[in-house]
Every structure is written in structure tokens, then in C-alpha cells.
Amino acid sequence: MAEAGARRPFFRRRKSCPFTGANAPKIDYKDSKLLMRYVSERGKIVPSRITAVSAKKQRELARAIKRARFLGLLPYVIR
């Protein structure tokens, strides 16, 4: 039997991917405002375990960020 004061462990519900769904935004290298939400304050790409982006969309996002950096739309390093 379980103790009277024992609680069951808290499980955080998995967030759904912000790029899947009916009215989800498209990942585009020209949309620097959207891409900046997935870049840290130091300029690094934020991992999907923090942003809850699916693996496929994370690869698309990384490709778009790298393309935008190459074209000068996003900085490589933010000081």
C-alpha cells in the first residue's frame, strides 16, 4: 500500500511542435523575426528539447538560420 503522505511524481506534459498544425508559420530564411526566436542571446541555435520543435522541423529551422546568417540577415554572434 502507498503511504498516506506519498504523492505520485509530477510529469510535465510534452509541448507540441509550434510548426505543425493548421495555421502554423512556415520556416523561411527571409523571416528573420521568426528565426530570432530560436536563436539564443549569444547567437546560438536553441535546442529542440527547450523549444519543443520536432526533429524534422528543427533541421529545417537550423538550415534556415544558417542560410540567413550566410546572407547577412542574421548575425553569427550577438555581443
Curated annotation (Swiss-Prot):
Q: Which GO terms describe its cellular component?
A: cytosolic small ribosomal subunit
> Mind listing the UniProt keywords for this protein, alphabetically?
Ribonucleoprotein, Ribosomal protein, RNA-binding, rRNA-binding
Metal-binding in keyword set: no
Write down the Gene3D superfamilies for this protein, in alphabetical order.
Answer: Ribosomal protein S18
Q: Which GO terms describe its molecular function?
A: small ribosomal subunit rRNA binding; structural constituent of ribosome
GO terms, biological process = translation
InterPro entries linked to this entry: Ribosomal_bS18, Ribosomal_bS18_CS, Ribosomal_bS18_sf
Q: Which family does it belong to?
A: Belongs to the bacterial ribosomal protein bS18 family.
Q: Subunit arrangement?
A: Part of the 30S ribosomal subunit. Forms a tight heterodimer with protein bS6.
As for what it does, the entry says:
Binds as a heterodimer with protein bS6 to the central domain of the 16S rRNA, where it helps stabilize the platform of the 30S subunit.
**Could you tell me which HAMAP family the record lists for this protein?**
Ribosomal_bS18 (MF_00270)
Report what the protein is called.
Answer: Small ribosomal subunit protein bS18
Origin species? Bradyrhizobium diazoefficiens (strain JCM 10833 / BCRC 13528 / IAM 13628 / NBRC 14792 / USDA 110)
